[in-house]
């Protein structure tokens, strides 16, 4: 907690108000407290002299209330109740409802008056709509914004009349009211619900969000993927709002927790400890707002409303305001802000008055943010594992190319010389790295000849470079690349200021555009060390998908290579940083010293007007000849050339061994296997697969009923042991395995699976008894097929038939009589069968099957893979028919279950009655009657009984009713 704290200056109690919302008018004269029955208007200049009431008839509480922020409309305020908004007018000591806004279909969550237009009011609701109303015409909203999720907060930008922000669970959307169809920018701000949202009072791009995830984050919506800073808290944050002075922030914790009733004042430049704590409320703070500063006074007043039904006004004097100020080297800070990030046109909302003030001649530079608190450093170490840890690594990893910069690096001497040429100015600087660098040890910067800039500019550059280096090394990060960027950016900004001053000597400095707020930032270069391990983007690629299509993309035909074919491809995405902005161009590195390291400089230089893309790193637009047309001024060479190639989807079904038409024509009739094989042969003939016609013809003969095996193993050798039996079928399966024809494999396995089943016998877990599943050999003689559904699973060269050995299989069977079993089967059989005749019958059941039961698992994989292909084809009924023949039982349950032992025979019981002794499983420890209904038991001693008896016993007792001495309430929960 902060060392400084204070109690309130003014306390006013409203015991009967039951107000849930509060607002202070823009003049600082009145506050409105919104209850269910009355609205209380409090005179803040004389809060003890009574208050006025406005009666309201509603069963709904007021969710949000706000005065109009414009002086000419200061007597209007809006209050939301359920699905409507009432507009009140307070004048001459009396108030009345002026009009009502109705349009939402769900509860209104928030409202906000426009900062620049007094007639506009925005409302948000959980019905996913955000409405902008004009109070001059309240029949319907003038603008409707729609989102997927409901909005909990809505706030107008304090510097841009067209910009507003809304929060949706943990996300923030930035809107332009002129483009209501879609949001301008999206921020994935928090992992939990956002409770508070507030724009910076001096910058149109910066906002703060407070969330249920115990944090307040600061954002520049031009950089939606990276927050500027974070304020970690111990509990969820209800509201976080900027102060009207300096760089302060006030936070309040979530009301539902009832832990912290104080308000905390923070300096956004130092978020480690609050600079002030407002202590006094006995219950959670529901709302707080700032009162307008009185004329001639430097003090501010903070007005708060709490659930303890007290209104308190806190005085914030100039001394407290200075705690939030950052007055160190104001001139340098103003200079830093003058070279701040220039907005991207597609992400920045400009007003008509300021459009001409923004230029993009120098691209953009990443915005700076403040160092995070120390307790976050440990959490971010994992993000820095890819960063260089030594100077040698830093020199070798730098892959950034900056225009007009020469760098000579000497890792042995731990130094480098940087030369920058900008306009008529030249800067040469010596950078020396201490031995502890980059572990909280910053390098030193020294200007050397020839350097042509002024002493004032040298001081400013040194200040900026030292600050940038310190911010990096505090977190153990390398700083050479960020310092190079800052050096060039500052120097070019200084030169531009000189040029603009000389071209317009009558222009007033900063007469139109105020400087951006002094908000701390840290340079995070795009495509820098963080991307050193990310492969360089592709300009072409191809991918197979499971439905028989090939998706690929290539470079446009209008482009050709910009570099020679021998030029090495960049190794990582960090090389693309040279093309991210117009400010950056190839860096030329001198390598006079033999031991120096040379940076990558093989990319082509591009002009300022060329568009930046991944393709432009490899290719450049072909120079097209221009022909004059008959029409004057037309030029065929000026036509637009596409900067990206097309994405093409190609049907490659003709190259695959599976056919969708066969999938539609194939049948599986388990009642007539002969008819199934004959019709499938006819279907194969229709699509021109003569090889499959022969296969299905052989299958028709092999499934003839006259070849059916006898039940007695002593009568004859089963047909499956014949060379044209199982051996022929296995050779067919091996052949189509080599062809990756999973369609034929699955259909053959399904047909012969159905042929081996006894008529009328259901098969939930396989064609053989469950106990024989222990005898299935784990290895497979077929290639591995998975049910991924991708064509790559059938065309992967890694799928081979090396495990399929017909000769070895035959030798194995010829070495012993057909009725004998292998030693492995005998070993398992001796454990499973007590009667040798039973084992012999079971072995006969396996030998008479055309499909080897040892490969059942692989046959199931064929069917699952083919079923996945049928699903992608949209043949779901065919898929269901095939999957009916999957014979493997479901995986056994591996979770935790509570079992019961019978109190009589000590057998495991799954119900209330024992299946062995037929007695009831357990008795109540109190009434000694069998328990059949609701029961509770101690997990330590195992005693228990009827729930009602146990509850009544433990109302007055602490030990087990059986007298075992167990303290059941402490050991387990009843």
Curated annotation (Swiss-Prot):
The GATOR2 complex is negatively regulated by the upstream amino acid sensors CASTOR1 and SESN2, which sequester the GATOR2 complex in absence of amino acids. In the presence of abundant amino acids, GATOR2 is released from CASTOR1 and SESN2 and activated. Zn(2+) 4 binds at residues 943, 960, 964. Residues 393-494 form the RWD domain. Residues 350-374, 831-852 are annotated as: Disordered. WD repeats lie at residues 57-98, 103-143, 146-185, 189-229, 232-276, 278-318, 319-362, 668-706. A zinc finger (C4-type) spans 901-920. Belongs to the WD repeat WDR59 family. As a component of the GATOR2 complex, functions as an activator of the amino acid-sensing branch of the mTORC1 signaling pathway. The GATOR2 complex indirectly activates mTORC1 through the inhibition of the GATOR1 subcomplex. GATOR2 probably acts as an E3 ubiquitin-protein ligase toward GATOR1. In the presence of abundant amino acids, the GATOR2 complex mediates ubiquitination of the NPRL2 core component of the GATOR1 complex, leading to GATOR1 inactivation. In the absence of amino acids, GATOR2 is inhibited, activating the GATOR1 complex. This is GATOR2 complex protein WDR59. It comes from Homo sapiens.
